[in-house]
């Protein structure tokens, strides 16, 4: 007598035969996988090649899913940020080598900061043939520096105001003149007839420089207010200050108008 097979077992072991219709379905067990992980797959065509393609696609999806999950748990290290630029070195941090002692001596002798000492050296390079003069008023409240030749050409004006205050000066461009200190101590007098600004120290009354209103690019500096050691020679050139009678008449009118004494300034201060 023949054995009676279980219908489910027979259906599972059944293989496709050439005579089966194309629409027949075959149940294929997935090799190498457990029933829980890889259930039976039904392919409409009943082809092993189609099942393998589907299985490969499923495995690739699982691999990508595991890779994404691993990346979210353990992200890749980000690229290191670029180092911030190093701050600019200050003059104190410059590698001066064997010249550091000379640098410090020069700076202390002139009483300058590192920036001021560097400016003096750069100005010396930019103004060849000129000398760095320093000066100020009698009490020291006003101090200035100017680049000018060692041989000074001094103007001696004969106008009424310059004769009364004995003002002699040499002219320099404003770019070469620097007021070091005392801006708050300066009192400026402006005459009524000539556009000139005569600056005096409010403490000691010494006039060390003046400027012209018409040409602020030029300063007149008093040579007798310069510090010693930088002037080699002085050449004085006298210039006329106009008609004394006309100046006296203008001064008389100004006295009655302003109730205070005023006198004309140098008429040639605007020149050069």
From Swiss-Prot:
GO terms for molecular function: carbon-sulfur lyase activity; metal ion binding. Zn(2+) 1 binds at residues 137, 139, 201, 204. It comes from the Eukaryota. Binds 2 Zn(2+) ions per subunit. Its cofactor is Zn(2+). The keyword Flavoprotein does not apply. Pfam families: GFA. The keyword Nucleus does not apply. This is Centromere protein V-like protein 3. It comes from Homo sapiens. The lineage of its organism: Eukaryota, Metazoa, Chordata, Craniata, Vertebrata. The gene is CENPVL3.
